[in-house]
Amino acid sequence: HIEGIREHDNMEVQRMEGLILTKENFTDCVDAATGKPIPREGNVVLPETVIYHGEEYKVTEIGRFAFSGCNNLTSINIPDSVTEIGTFSFSGCNNLTSINIPDGVTKIGPHAFRGCSSLVSVSIPDSVTIIGESAFIGCNGLTSVNIPDSVTSIKFRAFSDCSSLVSVS
């Protein structure tokens, strides 16, 4: 039974457990419920399922560079089906002020929110165990972060250059 696709570093596409939204496949995906393209600006609510090349898939990961450099993205609500926020997935989203990280996410990848200078606070759910290298580096507007006991690894420079950070709980 085929449930999704996953892109590998060599760009060959293999069918796996779920769809990883990446910069390369993003424009080929539409919201399964509405049939409309997934927006990359404003207040975005990511769908739990998408249609990709005529087949329906559950979104399981926000992959590398999926929203990188989307300067008009202001908020994002990630569906419960997502378990990983990948490398550089939201890097350079200068106007991103709000993000909802769902309970199913276990890993926030390297550079995931790098340079999201308008992000003010982040609440990391109890399911997260790893915060990747430089995950929030350069988030100058970040004033508070809630890190649960479930996090067992905070990689090098995860919160480096967060000059406004005053509260970590």
Can you annotate each of these PLM segments?
Residues 63-66, 86-91, 109-114, 132-135, ...:
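Consensus positions within tandem repeat domains that build extended binding/scaffold surfaces
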